[in-house]
Amino acid sequence: PADPACANRPSDLPGDYRPFCRPDGLRGARIGVPRPAASDRARFRFSGYHDGADAVFARALAAMRDGGARVVDAVEVPGAEQEPDAEDELVVLCHEFHDGADRYLAARAEAAGAGPRSLSEVIAFNTAHADTELVLFGQDLLERAVATAGLDDEGYRAARARCVASARANGIDYALDRGGLDALAVLTTAPAWCIDHVNGDTFLGAGYSIAAVAGYPSITVPIGMVHGLPVGLALLGRAWSEAVLLRLAAGLEALLGLSLRPAYAPSSILA
């Protein structure tokens, strides 16, 4: 209730979502599949960045059709095709992280009677213990975040507005409204990659990113494995559509009937 994002919460939202989790939840639904980005520089990439994961994703879409859903291919999402302004998203990240981290740390230290009370104190601790805390990575983002001017900063507000517009009005809302869709289906992300202390992360893409930027709900369902690594399908919806997404996800989960158990790979060389 203290979250300002919930200030406009509709009064008719259900108090119990369990009745929406039905095995026939896909029947009659209209699911849109955004077309793969035309460029690696697209702001949001929904699929097309890992062949093995794409194949599993395609099989899951076929299963959704078998389950009674109308799957609409090549849905247009204008905001996704824009060249990314990484600086905008970084500005938002740093401002919000500084604000949230300071609030959390202050409350935690107050309750525990010990510990760092701010992001500045975390940075100072890391610096004082660099031989153990900063061996494998620095704290550049922490330092950039702590230098921000708060959530009333004009630059932050402008950057956030641009990010939200691309993900909402020109993104999820546009696609759902234009196609009369219940949700969008995207590849959640590529299979997990190995930790590489020399070259860094091998991050290929994440279909759910647009929902995170919009502040809209999403849910991911396990749909299979690639080289023993799990792959998921994410369903993205408009604001306050949790009931719809739970119904669709429950239907897909029941239809696939998978039981995927996590396990340690014996080596980074996967067959």
Where is each model-derived feature located?
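Short, surface-exposed loop/helix-turn segments at secondary-structure junctions
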Residues: 11, 45, 157-158, 179, ...
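Small-aliphatic-rich amphipathic alpha-helix that forms the alpha element of a beta-alpha
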Residues: 170-174, 197-222
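A short helix-breaking turn/cap at a secondary-structure junction
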Residues: 1-55, 128, 254-271
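Acidic-enriched catalytic cores of C-N bond-cleaving enzymes acting on peptides and small amides
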Residues: 1-15, 43-82, 91-126
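Short helix-loop capping/hinge segments that flank enzyme active sites or metal/cofactor-binding pockets
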Residues: 20, 25-43, 92-168, 173, ...
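Short, well-ordered beta-strand elements
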Residues: 221, 229-238, 246-247
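Flexible loop/turn segments at secondary-structure boundaries
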Residues: 39-42, 79-83, 192-195, 227-229, ...
